[in-house]
Amino acid sequence: MRKEWATYLKLALEKLLTDEATLAKMSFRVIENVLKFKKQSEELISRVFLEKEDHDNFKLALREALEHSLNLNSNQSAEFMAKYLDMHLKKSPASNSLESEQDLRVVIADVINVFRYVKSKDVFEEFYARSLSRRLLLKKSATREAE
């Protein structure tokens, strides 16, 4: 059963990361979708598997699937993560409202949890530094503390 679960996870994550419609319109949504999928999978594992050993085996399959899928094109995954964080760390020009500090911390923690699996950390750093400097120079940063 674990093998089928692992296969399903890999296929579903690969589909999320290669969805042409999402990639063409809003690439940052790819990471949002991956984070939602990860959360839903973790909740499912917690509800279904009450024994620690089973729970741990299926969580391991999820981690392996994330690592495999995010590194199929790790440069692209790292870029999308930087764009996703940039979107949340900017002031919203349309509504002029900021995300609450708690929401922002949750987003950052979620991205960090997935970032561990990406091998191209240097690519992420490059894109993040570029967007950080742009936010700071244009004074579009939502909060200095989060930066």
Could you tell me what each predicted segment is?
Residues M1-E147:
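Eukaryotic scaffold/interaction segments
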